Amino acid sequence: MRLRLLLLSCFTLSCLMTAPSTAAAACEADGAVQFVCGPVSPEDLAIVPESPWLIASGMEDDGYLYLVDTRDYSSAVLYPLPSAQPRHDTVSYGDCPGPNMSAFRPHGINLTTGADGAYRLYVVRHGARESIEVFDIDMTGATPSLTWIGCVLAPEAVVFNSVVALPEGGIAATHFQMPDGSV
């Protein structure tokens, strides 16, 4: 079921990046293909386990994380929002200078489930800074919400691409390109 949902979601969001059709422009189904309206430049997806929710990163100039409801294919901005309340974990992310809401520009994302069952989202961020931003996901409301808890700044001349959480709290990230655009 999860694999089917992931494949459907990947296919659906990839359709948004191809040449638009009349059905896609109106966000109506085109035969068996369903479209998701709203996310701009979707780059990566993460399924929120045991829920109808997907998180999509939108790598545009300002950039957002989007929450997609797989039941009706609707979407909404998840982060950054003016109402966001950060909770900086300075023990785990002491080298992080704090939240920066401007020019978010998210790229690769990875969602993990902790030993306590809580979800954590790791987000490669370009824009105002090159970093991996870390969020706790709150599933207690009608829709999930994010709380920013910290970041890991990229070393000089490193441009992250994808990120994955490792056992015992570590993370690994790929280096996409040099700041001048060379690979």
Task: Cite the ranges covered by each PLM segment.
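A short helix->beta-strand "capping" segment at the edge of beta-propeller domains
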Residues: 24-41, 146
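Beta-strand-rich domains and repeat architectures in extracellular enzymes and scaffolds
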Residues: 34-64
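Surface loop/turn motifs at the tips and blade-to-blade linkers of beta-strand repeat domains
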Residues: 35-38, 79-81, 99-101, 151-156
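Beta-rich catalytic cores
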Residues: 41, 61, 105, 128, ...
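Residue-level detector of Asp-centered blade-edge/turn motifs that repeat once per structural unit
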Residues: 48-51, 112-117, 165-168
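Short, conserved, GDST-rich strand-edge loop motifs in beta-rich repeat architectures
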Residues: 56-62, 123-124, 173-183
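Short loop/turn segments immediately following beta-strands, especially the blade-tip
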Residues: 68-73, 135-144
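Blade-loop segments of beta-propeller domains
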Residues: 70-113
